[in-house]
Amino acid sequence: MVKTWEEFLKQEAKQPYFIELMEAVKDARAKGNVYPTEEDMFSCFRLCPYDQVKVVILGQDPYHGPGQAHGLSFSVQKGVRIPPSLRNIYKELKTDLDIEPADHGYLAKWAEQGVLLMNTSWSVEEGKAGSHKKLGWATFTDHVLEELNNYDKPLVFILWGNHAIKAASGITNPQHLLIKGVHPSPLAASRGFFESKPFSKTNAFLEEHGRKPIDWDLNEQ
């Protein structure tokens, strides 16, 4: 088991699949716009250090519009329009914990409290959803989740939609809580995402295991 994400990345960097993957992403960047930027590709690790993880929210792939993705699943930079899925997440937060929706979509405050906001694909070409999912990111994500499955404290995995549920099928350690539900996208949310109460369930589990709950409120104090 690793002790830091830096150690984990160094370990992966030696593996042939990862060398090929980084080359493929580099080639794609040379030909056009790829999101997020190279500096932000692993920012979920930077903002949520390995020894601080409490919750994992698994997304699919980064937003593919200019200026949106910055390496945290579901999150956008401040000043960027809040995407529809995140608006629905905010609606559920209001129903679940009576937290008013923030006027921005920047989720760094969650990450800094131990919420690992990761996607299963970690890069994407501009305007082409899912364009990098076959580059080798699935192997990388499996390895991240393997580390988390062996984590020494109980974690909560929030899995919205079949893609996330399938991707996390290797999370078998009984100490963890898996919250499985419908994806918050406008196409699916009305089929069971609303009133599923993932945020209060997460905090109840953390408190039960002696861990500090997440302050989900993103409004400027």
Swiss-Prot record:
It is found in: Cytoplasm. The active site is at D61 (proton acceptor). One of its GO terms (molecular function) is uracil DNA N-glycosylase activity. It is an enzyme of class 3 (hydrolase). Gene3D superfamilies: Uracil-DNA glycosylase-like domain (3.40.470.10). Transmembrane segments: none annotated. Keywords: Cytoplasm, DNA damage, DNA repair, Hydrolase. One of its GO terms (biological process) is base-excision repair, AP site formation via deaminated base removal. It comes from the Bacteria. CDD domains: UDG-F1-like (cd10027). It catalyses: Hydrolyzes single-stranded DNA or mismatched double-stranded DNA and polynucleotides, releasing free uracil. Pfam families: UDG. GO terms for cellular component: cytoplasm. Its EC number is 3.2.2.27. Belongs to the uracil-DNA glycosylase (UDG) superfamily. UNG family. PANTHER family: URACIL-DNA GLYCOSYLASE. Excises uracil residues from the DNA which can arise as a result of misincorporation of dUMP residues by DNA polymerase or due to deamination of cytosine. NCBIfam families: PRK05254.1-1 (NF003588), PRK05254.1-2 (NF003589), PRK05254.1-5 (NF003592), ung (TIGR00628). This is Uracil-DNA glycosylase 1. It comes from Listeria monocytogenes serotype 4b (strain F2365). The lineage of its organism: Bacteria, Bacillati, Bacillota, Bacilli, Bacillales. The gene is ung1.
